[in-house]
C-alpha cells in the first residue's frame, strides 16, 4: 500500500510538472485573424493594438526598415498604389510558442506601376508565407516573409510562366 501511495504521488507530481499547453497560442491565432482585418482595411487602430512600436518591417519600397503599426500599414499602402483592390486571405495558420506561421492568398488587379512594370489591368493571385513573432504582451514584434514576388510578377506578365 505504501508503494501504491508513493507511485500515485509520483504520478501526480509528474502530471503537475509537465509542460502545460501555451494559452498564448490561441490568443496569437486570434490576433492573426484581426491582423487579416487590419491589412485588408488599413485600420490604424487595429495596427496600434496588434503591432509593437519597435517592430521592424521591410519592403522593396523603402531602403530602411519601417517600424510599428504605421510602418506595416505603409507596406499595405505601397501595395495599394499598384493593386488598389489588393486583399489578403488567411488560408492556413500554425502556431507554436510565440510564433505563428500564416499562408496567405494575396490577390488584386494591377492598375498602377509595380516595381517598374507599368499597369497591365491583369488580376493576379499568389500564395505568400509569413512568420509572425509575438512578445509577452501579445503584440507582433517581427514578421519574416517568404516573398511571393515571383507569383505577383508572373501574374502581371512581367515574367513568363
Predicted regions and their residues:
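Bacterial N-terminal signal peptides
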Residues: 6-15
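Short, low-complexity N-terminal intrinsically disordered segments enriched in polar/charged residues
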Residues: 17-53, 159-161
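Exposed beta-sheet edge and beta->alpha loop/turn motif
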Residues: 105-136
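A mature extracytoplasmic/lumenal domain signature
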Residues: 61, 94, 106-108, 147
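Positively charged n-region of N-terminal signal peptides that target proteins for export
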Residues: 1-4
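A solvent-exposed, acidic/Ser-Thr-rich amphipathic alpha-helical stretch
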Residues: 27, 44-97
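Short beta-strand edge/turn micro-motifs at domain boundaries
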Residues: 101, 125-154
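Hydrophobic pocket/interface hotspot
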Residues: 35, 46-48, 55, 72, ...
Amino acid at each position: 500500500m505504501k508503494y501504491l501511495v508513493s507511485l500515485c504521488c509520483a504520478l501526480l507530481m509528474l502530471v503537475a510538472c509537465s509542460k502545460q499547453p501555451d494559452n498564448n497560442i490561441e490568443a496569437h491565432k486570434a490576433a492573426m485573424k484581426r491582423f487579416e482585418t487590419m491589412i485588408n482595411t488599413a485600420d490604424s487602430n487595429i495596427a496600434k493594438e496588434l503591432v509593437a512600436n519597435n517592430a521592424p518591417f521591410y519592403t522593396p519600397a523603402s531602403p530602411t526598415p519601417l517600424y510599428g503599426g504605421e510602418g506595416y500599414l505603409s507596406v499595405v499602402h505601397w501595395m495599394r498604389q499598384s493593386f488598389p483592390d489588393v486583399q489578403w486571405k488567411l488560408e492556413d495558420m500554425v502556431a507554436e510558442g510565440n510564433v505563428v506561421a500564416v499562408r496567405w492568398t494575396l490577390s488584386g488587379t494591377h492598375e498602377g506601376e509595380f516595381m517598374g512594370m507599368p499597369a497591365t489591368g491583369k488580376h493576379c493571385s499568389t500564395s505568400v508565407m509569413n512568420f509572425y513573432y509575438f512578445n509577452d504582451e501579445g503584440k507582433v514584434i517581427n514578421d519574416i516573409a517568404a516573398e511571393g514576388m515571383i507569383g505577383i510578377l508572373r501574374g502581371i506578365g512581367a515574367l513568363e510562366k
